[in-house]
Amino acid sequence: SDGISRSGPLDLMSFRGMPLGELTFKDVKVPAGSALMVAGFKGMMEGINLARVDAASYGCGFIRAAIRECCVRANNRTAFGQPLSNIQVIQTKIGLMATDYEAARLLTLAASDSFALGHGGDPILLSKAKLFSTDAAMRHAVEAVQIFGALGVHHSSRVQRLFRDSKALQIFDGT
């Protein structure tokens, strides 16, 4: 349409498997019957609430992936003559990941249920689920990079991708 343009995929540090672009509106004429009014704004907010459930779900998946990657690394890497998995601080870090995963999952399920009941869901519960899940994902992605050591920042490492994607997830879709 006249006055609407779109960019090619943005060169982002994260979510590289899901290209994002921009829409630009310049001097676009909107017919009076097509303008976003109160009912349309409500629908738009329901869309944002759905995006928050989506972000919370991603956060849960990222935490679970961090747990999986760290368990494999801890069982296969040795330090001080023993597997990392025998070192109490590593056990504690992975245990905290598992605890936050369960909390994030249950909060996300409650938020999803509220959305499924209609009327756009409980916006406070949806925001809590998004905030907790994405913050926990970031926190545990940082821990995963630490557990991996130098390999954690190498491009071939899965945890470096979790780190990049978790940061973006905190920013997307607001709170």
Map each language-model feature to its residues.
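C-terminal helix-coil-helix/basic helical segment that borders enzyme active sites and/or dimer interfaces
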Residues: 71-85, 98-132, 145-153
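Hydrophobic alpha-helical segments of membrane proteins
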Residues: 136-144
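Extended, low-aromatic, Leu/Ala- and acidic/polar-enriched alpha-helical coiled-coil segments
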Residues: 57, 88-98, 127-130, 135, ...
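Glycine-rich phosphate/cofactor-binding loops in nucleotide/flavin-utilizing enzymes
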Residues: 148-175
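FAD-binding core of flavoproteins
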Residues: 1-68, 72, 82
